[in-house]
Amino acid sequence: MASSQCCDNPPALNPTGGEGKVVDSFGGLKAYLAGSNDAKAAVILISDVFGFEAPNLRKIADKVALSGYFVVVPDFLHGDPYVPENAEKPLPVWMKSHPPKMGFQEAKQVIAALKEKGMSSIGAAGMVVVELAKTQEIQAVVALHPGPVTVEDIKEVKCPISILGAEIDQMSPPELVKQFEQVLSANSEVAHFVKIFPGVAHGWSVRYNHDDAAAVKSAKEALEDTINWFNKNLK
């Protein structure tokens, strides 16, 4: 079930933001692309409810690209991000039009397009990554302040997974994240890295307050951990 935390500190969307470019179709979806076409490894960044035009998300894409990756930020919301001010579409109603299962299926289309480009290894970060991690389609994932994920989901993970949790999180509280770690530690076949960031809330890595030095520092640390995980498992 969606938590109000998933909507805190909404971004001011910018369709022209970022150092990369927007294309009308990548794997059948409009997408923001960053990085070199000559890269051999790719990363898919999957947005939260506010979509692929979020400025911080595109900044993250640009920084991941600087580490040698071809980065895709698909518009899984099809031009319909959640708008808190729209009283006609409260979050539960909006979610019915954008079920995570749909994003999972469309992510597989993006993975197929990356393979057609010759990418030898593919990682993903953001929403639905745990579902992707249950398949053989992807080589590494990073779950940032994960949403509705269960212990049973984690038991099905087949690829290296990093879980970066928040101390203040109603959707995946620290107690649950620690259970995830216990499950992963018992599975010697799946590499894992689990970390709980103190003093931050769900969504902090992409919807932090730029005027909050501690929040900015934590978001930077989460990005460094994300890139390090991909460097370790995709290159």
Where are these regions (language model features)?
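Alpha/beta-hydrolase-fold catalytic nucleophile elbow
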Residues: 142-145, 164, 197-198
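Short beta-strand/loop motif that positions the catalytic acidic residue
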Residues: 157, 163-165
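Catalytic histidine neighborhood in serine/cysteine hydrolases
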Residues: 184-208
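Conserved alpha/beta-hydrolase "acid-adjacent" motif
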Residues: 170-179
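Serine-hydrolase catalytic machinery in alpha/beta-hydrolase-like enzymes
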Residues: 4-117, 204-209
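Primarily recognizes the serine-hydrolase "nucleophile elbow" in alpha/beta-hydrolase
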Residues: 107-158
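Catalytic active-site module of serine/aspartate enzymes centered on a nucleophile-bearing elbow/loop
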Residues: 211-235
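Hydrophobic beta-strand scaffold residues
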Residues: 71-72, 161, 192
